Amino acid sequence: MYKDKVVIVTGGANGIGRCIADEFRSQGAVVHVIDKQEGEHFVGDISQKEVLEAFASEVLSKHDKVDVIINNALPLMKGIDECSYEDFQYALSVGVTAPFYLVKLLKNHLAEGASIINISSSRDRMSQPQTESYTAAKGGIAALTHALAVSLSGRARVNSISPGWIDTAYTVYDGPDAIQQPAGRVGNPMDIANMVLFLCSDKAGFITGENICIDGGMTKQMIYHGDGGWKLEK
């Protein structure tokens, strides 16, 4: 399905990003990864405009068209007590500005039937304390998704995925960690990669501007103290 398709994955050296990149490669795609971590991929900090320009130039020096862009790179997570102005701006640069600018750099080089997937988070709709930088960035990329879908109408489909608890080490949990999930388990990177490959395929050709939350049902579960055995402990 993806033989010889040109795929870009930001933050593709580890975790969900690496799983996505590996799955595309397994189906014959040519995958270009950018990540801060050293490796055989393009190494750079996507918060820097010049880095994104250099990366896009390298990709376009090898290919006329790009079929898939996966904006996956992870913004930092700091809360209101410890997050500085600079930290917050950095999180937004990685999580919102970089996805916008990378698409802008490549928008005139999108192949017919191109697809863009933005990796958000279930934190785009719910929060824990002291997560403001990450939550704001993930909310931003979710909103950016439907804006891009409209602006790129006829040129690319743009969708976002909001993962819940995804254990990148593929740990198998039991007890409360698993039972609390309506799906009965904690997620793993393949849960996200499978949806990415579906959304980028012709089978999803009538889906654009959408957000799909893959969280085992956690965001749909109402929890009150004393209900169903749940107790608030302080």
Regions found by a protein language model. Name each.
Residues 72-77, 217:
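Conserved NAD(P)H cofactor-binding loop of Rossmann-fold oxidoreductase domains
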Residues 79-92, 177:
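Substrate-binding pocket helix/loop in short-chain dehydrogenase/reductase
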Residues 108, 149-154, 205:
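Alpha-helical segment proximal to the catalytic Tyr-Lys
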Residues 160-161, 175-207, 214-216:
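C-terminal helical subdomain
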